[in-house]
């Protein structure tokens, strides 16, 4: 399996302290791989100088854009994809809790399993996690809910690194309505519903200790969005409608 160009879509929000270093680290890694690539940084309405820090890099392989207001990671990724030109697309969170070098692991799984989509999975048996206990508990409960509602052949949907053949996103993104909490789930449910093969790969996650307690509002919105996906899939069959 070959590809002509990789588009790395990197959503960021209020990351002015680390964003420049993280982008340079990402650029350096892909430069050493010797592949054709572009890095598209989408600032999701940051209130600090994140966007300015990216622009200051003046790197021809890095394109920077900014949303007028904060609309959510999902919307940022959709807008970034519109700017992309690669036939292979990777989602990569801008905080680099997951290092870009894991692209090689995901791409190898894509080749080996002849998959259309490969997602990093915190629940993969070979994953290495520096991950708060409260987040692990929430992940386990959410996995149970997703399995119950959708029966997806996946153990994780929310990890911030994913690799797609661009055609998958071209055929699914226009149907994705969720902008924030369950965006990843809706995209993967839709891809699976359309018959694309999705595989999982192990990840090394190095959370940097910036997470506090999970807010009740976040949990509520996550569950609400998840039920909305179920409603669109099984009740009104929105994803089957032509658009």
Language-model regions, residue ranges each:
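Short helix-capping segments at alpha-helix termini
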Residues: 30-35, 57-62
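N-proximal low-complexity "stem/linker" segments adjacent to membrane-targeting elements
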Residues: 1-28
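Short beta-strand/loop segment that forms part of the nucleotide-sugar
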Residues: 35-45, 65-67
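Acceptor/aglycone-binding surface of glycosyltransferases and processive sugar-polymer synthases
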Residues: 63-83, 88-91, 100-181, 207-227
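Acidic donor-diphosphate engagement hotspot in glycosyltransferases and nucleotidyltransferases
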Residues: 22, 50, 77, 101-103, ...
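Hydrophobic helical membrane-anchoring modules
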Residues: 1-6, 147-152, 175-243
């Amino acid at each position: 399996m070959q590809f002509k160009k990789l588009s790395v879509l990197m959503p960021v929000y209020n990351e002015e302290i680390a964003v420049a270093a993280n982008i340079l680290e990402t650029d350096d890694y892909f430069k050493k791989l010797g592949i054709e690539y572009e890095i598209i940084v989408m600032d999701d309405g940051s209130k600090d100088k994140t966007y300015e820090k990216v622009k200051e890099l003046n790197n021809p392989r890095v394109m920077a854009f900014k949303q007028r207001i904060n609309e959510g990671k999902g919307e940022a990724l959709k807008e970034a994809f519109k700017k992309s030109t690669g036939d292979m697309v990777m989602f990569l969170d801008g905080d680099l809790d997951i290092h870009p070098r894991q692209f090689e692991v995901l791409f190898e799984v894509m080749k080996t399993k002849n998959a259309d989509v490969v997602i990093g999975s915190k629940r993969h048996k070979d994953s290495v996690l520096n991950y708060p206990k409260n987040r692990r508990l929430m992940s386990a409960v959410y996995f149970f809910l997703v399995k119950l509602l959708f029966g997806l052949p996946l153990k994780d949907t929310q990890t911030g690194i994913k690799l797609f053949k661009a055609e998958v996103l071209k055929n699914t993104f226009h149907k994705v309505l969720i902008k924030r909490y369950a965006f990843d789930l809706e995209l993967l449910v839709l891809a699976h519903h359309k018959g694309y093969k999705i595989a999982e790969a192990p990840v090394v996650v190095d959370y940097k200790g910036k997470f506090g307690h999970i807010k009740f509002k976040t949990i509520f919105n996550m569950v609400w969005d998840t039920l909305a996906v179920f409603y669109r899939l099984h009740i009104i069959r929105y994803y089957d409608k032509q658009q």
